[in-house]
Amino acid sequence: MTKGIIAAAVVMLVASASSAAPYRPSDDATVLVTVPPAAASTQTAFRTAQNALAANPNDLDLALEVARAAIRDGRASADPRRYGQAQAALAPWWSIPNPPMSVRVLRAIVRQSLHDFAGAEADLEAILRLDPRNGQARLTRAFVRQTVGSLADAKDDCRRLPPSVGALAAAVCWLRVQALTGSAASALERLDQVIKIYGKVDPLVLRWAQAVGADMAAMLGQTEAADLHFSEATTDGGDIPTLVAFADHLLDSNRPAEVLTLLAGRSEADIVYLRLAIAGKRLDDARAPHWTALLADRFAAANAGGVQLHLREEARFELEVRGDAATALKLALANWKIQKEPSDARLVLQTALAANDPAAAADVLAFIEKTGLADTRIKPLQDKIAEKKS
């Protein structure tokens, strides 16, 4: 059971990079990335299952199999079409008030991927009312709550996780909340200990724990420790959100050339192209104008279509690539209303400073004070805003 639980949980997390809306190709035939033979074999099996489900759409077990596979692939590739495939697989039960619990958990995950956090939490709450010891729902809700900044509630969910989730998964849940509330040093120390004890149980759980550890180390300004954790989290090549989080760490460490190497040929998702564009601009790479124009077109198309899942990425694009601080601040504040990860807080502070509008950061500063968040990537920004106010 643990693998299924963790597969659901990692969709929710991994350094928050996956919260942004990736590239949405207009044609399913569009090639996002060339896959190795093993992945191609998996995709063939997925299409076979899809075809079988098309012939018998009310087969619940088959629908769950297809939906779970689609979600796993969406998580790994940052391809939003996979979440659409998951929703399509669950179509007979999608709109009914009380679907089977297994459907409800997957519906919550898809809703979370679309930033419908309230809808996701409603589904998970309904499950936990009937089955308080449902580990998958409890763990998933804990990370939804972390994303929206409900840290006390997230801590409560982590505390109430049943043994079925496994010791390492439970530790990651609890320790990440500790890190987000001012205790990153002790949380990372404990996480490293737990990884040594339980890290051989499940490779998927271990990679997830390493990615969380990398973010904790980065919060503490421990560059080498973050490098090590990211390297461990990507030993098998890594999924796209984890690679993007690694790229952000490299950018923070002023290593843009390594970003271009890390992400070369990995995906055509927006979250990848954004990091390439930022790194390319810093290096004056000849490809940077192409990446910039491509992202500008995609964001314009998304806005024209009423899609607002890409606010964090678009804000960074406006700030770090285009240099439009006013637009970036507007987007960052809109994003802050939806999600409240450390990267979201940091973005508001960065854009407020760049736009010379420190007052715009008031809500974020209040949130930081309330939660006790201590992050070396954020503290200098707090200090600069305090200087401007004085």
Regions found by a protein language model. Give the residues of each.
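Short coil turns that delineate tetratricopeptide repeat
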Residues: 57, 98, 132, 165-166, ...
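Residue-level detector of the short coil/turn that links helix A to helix B
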Residues: 81, 115, 149, 182, ...
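N-terminal leader/linker segments that initiate helical-solenoid repeat arrays
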Residues: 18-102, 113, 387
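Canonical tetratricopeptide repeat
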Residues: 65, 106, 140, 173-174, ...
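Residue-level recognition of tetratricopeptide repeat
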Residues: 68, 75, 109, 143, ...
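Canonical positions in the second alpha-helix
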Residues: 52, 92-93, 126-127, 160-161, ...
